[in-house]
Amino acid sequence: MNAIFVANKPAGMSSNHFLGRLKRKYGVKKAGFSGTLDPFASGCLIVAFGSYTKFFRFLDKSPKVYEATIWLGASSPSMDNENITEISNVKELNLEKLEAIRGELIGKISYIPPKFSAKHVNGTRAYKLARSGEEFELKPEIMEIYESEILNYSHPFLTLRLSVSEGSYIRSYAEIFGQKVGYNVTLSSLKRVSEGKFRYENEKFLNICNFLNIEQNTYFGDINNILDGKELKINDFETQTQGIYLLNYDKFMSVIQIMDDTINYTLNKVEKC
């Protein structure tokens, strides 16, 4: 079965564990997800079955929208609610100061990814090294905060809604926010609300063509050439400029790349659900 939909991952389990539940629920063997959610996080998880997993890299998943609650005065090496090491009774802040800091953190921000993350360090996930107590450093990266809004402040908990670029770490955003406040902080909760046009709709199967970030092209030649995986000629295409294109037919889809007047199959004959 080929399908794509948004699932609502609950807090308290890994994305892989949750995917296993979905595979058993729908009786499928091949499945995957795009964009890992940490175990403590909940919300939007894009899931695909069958050959649709091959389209993950072509999905339009930006911006990502999160609702995050920052715990002022709490310390955790993993910057979440699973490894709290200390809780300090810190002074309540006025909303004007919090709004000023929120406003400062709009745009592109340099940050260091959390050590408890899925980043690779010499082929090993960073969180595995962190859990084993190994010393290592991660390189600074850039994330972009498009929009932010304070939803609630009930001291010591500050809840914000953030619209961010793909690859952003909300735990790192919280750490920077805490540095500007002058408090140790951690996240007490994190919910991913949406990714681009993807949002939770009771696991409704979606038309994948509406979510692809690639332009459609038209092939005027014999469709059997595509079905048989034969060499295609550039003059048989409506658009002949270099790029990656979707060929969309009633029962299947293909993705091709035009490069130097040569046509290469990136994906071919993916059946529609």
Curated annotation (Swiss-Prot):
Keyword Membrane assigned: no
Active site: D38
Entry's family note: Belongs to the pseudouridine synthase TruB family. Type 1 subfamily.
Pfam families: TruB_N
Catalytic activity, reaction form: uridine(55) in tRNA = pseudouridine(55) in tRNA
Lineage, highest ranks first: Bacteria, Pseudomonadati, Campylobacterota, Epsilonproteobacteria, Campylobacterales
A GO biological process held by the record: tRNA pseudouridine synthesis
Top-level taxon: Bacteria
Function: Responsible for synthesis of pseudouridine from uracil-55 in the psi GC loop of transfer RNAs.
UniProt KW keywords: Isomerase, tRNA processing
Protein's UniProt name: tRNA pseudouridine synthase B
SS bond partners: none
GO MF annotation terms: RNA binding; tRNA pseudouridine(55) synthase activity
This enzyme's EC code(s): 5.4.99.25
Keyword NADP: no
Annotated NCBIfam families: TruB (TIGR00431)
